[in-house]
Design a protein with these regions (language model features):
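Amphipathic alpha-helical packing elements
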Residues: 111-143, 147
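Acidic, serine/threonine- and proline-rich low-complexity intrinsically disordered segments
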Residues: 1-117, 159-214
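Short, surface-exposed, low-complexity cationic segments
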Residues: 133-164, 168-170
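A generic structural micro-environment signature
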Residues: 125-128, 133-137, 149, 153, ...
């Protein structure tokens, strides 16, 4: 009986891998948690040269010639039989198994260490970092935030040397400005935006030099 169950598990893993090879990783259950991790892993890989694959698909830990990124869809499809089956149990494909497999294969501990999911701003406020893909395909660390919550912040934080992109919102959460240069924003676009905001929300504090109190 145990041998039959093991064979069924092996057949299931083979079928899943074949489906991925034929139709891509979209065949796998990717929830928000998995998508967010994959974006962070790709950001990490983009900004470190010690995390690539060579022609035979093996991982290399030194700077050298590489053909495709380890976290790319192309490589994940190519190597699916290596990273996915060890995490499949039974005959049900669960998102947690896919997440765990990717986390192990893409060295999630290093991703967590270098590409945080949250950040503390200079004014002491905790913010969630998103890793959004821009139109040109570049992944940027991004914070969507009401503009008053960055009052008292004058230097743009960075992740692996990349400035965080701020999507600034009005108190009603309407888009105001997008910037990755806070110092330039305060001296440039802010005076005109502030004038408009004061007219719409006269009871709010608009002194950007002082951090907003909770």
């Amino acid at each position: 009986a145990e041998r039959r169950v093991a064979a069924q598990d092996e057949d299931f893993a083979y079928a899943v891998c074949r489906a991925v090879e034929k139709n891509g990783i979209a065949r796998l259950p990717f929830g928000e948690k998995t998508k967010a991790f994959l974006a962070r892993a790709r950001f990490y890989e983009t900004h470190t040269r010690a995390f690539r694959t060579v022609d035979d698909g093996s991982a290399v830990s030194v700077v050298g010639t590489y053909t495709i990124a380890k976290s790319s869809e192309e490589n994940l499809i190519k190597t699916v039989r290596e990273w996915l089956p060890p995490f499949l149990t039974g005959t049900t494909l669960r998102e947690n198994a896919v997440y765990d497999a990717l986390y192990y294969y893409l060295d999630g501990a290093k991703v967590d260490k270098n590409v945080p999911q949250t950040i503390v701003l200079a004014n002491g406020k905790f913010c969630t970092l998103l890793y959004d893909t821009a139109a040109e395909g570049i992944i940027r660390p991004t914070i969507e935030i009401i503009v008053q919550k960055i009052f008292g912040c004058f230097e743009t934080p960075r992740v692996m040397g990349v400035p965080v992109l701020f999507k600034l919102l009005s108190p009603a959460r309407r888009p105001l400005q997008i910037t990755d240069d806070l110092a330039g924003f305060w001296s440039g676009a802010w005076p005109e935006i502030c004038k408009e905001m004061k007219g719409r929300y006269p009871k709010h504090n608009w002194d950007y030099r002082a951090a907003e109190r909770e």
